Amino acid sequence: IISGGENISSIEIENAIAKHPSVSLAAVVAKPDEKWGETPCAFVELIKDKPATEKEIIDFCRETLAGFKLPKSVIFCDLPKTSTGKIQKFELRKKVKELS
């Protein structure tokens, strides 16, 4: 992800989000942005009966990530996976483009 000329590792953001007590899985992809070029967009699968809000997730990330690395949006959903359990990021990229 390249946001405002800064390279951002999606894995670093995913690892930060995954430490939240309500998060089961997280995946981060680039979301097109007019001002910054791209911004991090997080897709989060929550643990059953452990709710969380977009603000909670972003505030949680703020404790360990630099401001420019914070996800600008968080979408809660079941993450698409292959038969071996790998997250299908290409499907998430398609979903982000539909939402933009």
Question: Where on the chain are the PLM-derived regions?
Answer:
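AMP-binding/adenylate-forming catalytic core of the ANL superfamily
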Residues: I1-K69, C77-P80, G85-K94
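Acidic/polar alpha-helix N-cap and adjacent early helical turns
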Residues: V96-S100
